[in-house]
């Protein structure tokens, strides 16, 4: 059994026991949260597709980690003008462990 869920403006395919990184969600490590934006649910030959989401379907996940990704460097330069701008960015993320999928 697996499901397609939407969180943080992106869609993820999840199954029980999976661990994935999503955009930062509020909560502490160990907290449980429900992902209710379930777009599709597949259980063997039984396929349910929402329009756009499935009613009464949810995915229960546990927050495994709150962290920040690797630093990326943004560097801008104008030739011959002496203009240089260096900027760094680290995106915050939440690591989730999928515990249960229910319909």
UniProtKB/Swiss-Prot annotation:
One of its GO terms (biological process) is translation. This protein binds to 23S rRNA in the presence of protein L20. HAMAP family: Ribosomal_bL21. Keywords: Ribonucleoprotein, Ribosomal protein, RNA-binding, rRNA-binding. It comes from Desulfotalea psychrophila (strain LSv54 / DSM 12343). Pfam families: Ribosomal_L21p (PF00829). The lineage of its organism: Bacteria, Pseudomonadati, Thermodesulfobacteriota, Desulfobulbia, Desulfobulbales. Part of the 50S ribosomal subunit. Contacts protein L20. This is Large ribosomal subunit protein bL21. Belongs to the bacterial ribosomal protein bL21 family.
């Amino acid at each position: 059994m697996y499901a397609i869920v939407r969180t943080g403006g992106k869609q993820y395919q999840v199954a029980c026991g999976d661990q994935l990184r999503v955009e930062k969600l509020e909560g502490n490590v160990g907290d449980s949260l429900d992902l209710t934006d379930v777009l599709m649910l597949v259980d063997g030959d039984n396929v349910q597709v929402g329009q756009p989401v499935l009613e009464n379907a949810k995915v229960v996940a546990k927050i495994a980690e709150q962290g920040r990704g690797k630093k990326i460097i943004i560097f801008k330069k104008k030739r011959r003008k002496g203009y240089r701008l260096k900027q760094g960015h680290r995106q915050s993320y939440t690591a989730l462990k999928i515990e249960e999928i229910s319909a």
